[in-house]
Amino acid sequence: MRHRKSGRKLNRSSSHRSALFRNMAKSLLTYGKIRTTEAKAKELRGVVEPLITLALRNDLHARRQAYKVLGSHQLVKRLFDEIGPKFVGVPGGYTRVLKLGAPRPGDNAPMAVIELTRLGDAEAAAKEAPAKEVAEEKAAKPAKKAAPKKAEKEEAEDAAEA
């Protein structure tokens, strides 16, 4: 019986499961967003959120604990220097799981996207700024070509009637 046992087994041995989540955590912290099954995404939250909490502590022992999970000095440096400061003052909820509409074609597994909440906001703001500049440039240019086209059509119709 499964009394008081937390977490999903995902049809894997414990070592396979821990390796899976370690690799997925590395990918999520590297890319900021990954696409996976719903169950894996929900379980991955339990691995990544404590890592970000460690990054908020920002001391030597926290770095060593993060290295124990991630196994990469570069990724630990990124976690503590880039990702951690974006979540200062946030009391949890560092990741977001968005369910995708279409299941995976091969086995019909429900899919989801897991992403870091603050990194997505920063990327969206960076994308919106250039988009606004382009919109302003388009608004500044007058539409000169619309009027001549109508005049050309009328002239063509007059020529066809004559």
From Swiss-Prot:
The keyword Ribosomal protein applies. Gene3D superfamilies: Ribosomal protein L17. It comes from the Bacteria. GO terms for biological process: translation. Residues 125-162 are annotated as: Disordered. It holds the Pfam family Ribosomal_L17. One of its GO terms (cellular component) is cytosolic large ribosomal subunit. NCBIfam families: L17. Part of the 50S ribosomal subunit. Contacts protein L32. Belongs to the bacterial ribosomal protein bL17 family. This is Large ribosomal subunit protein bL17. It comes from Oleidesulfovibrio alaskensis (strain ATCC BAA-1058 / DSM 17464 / G20) (Desulfovibrio alaskensis). The gene is rplQ.
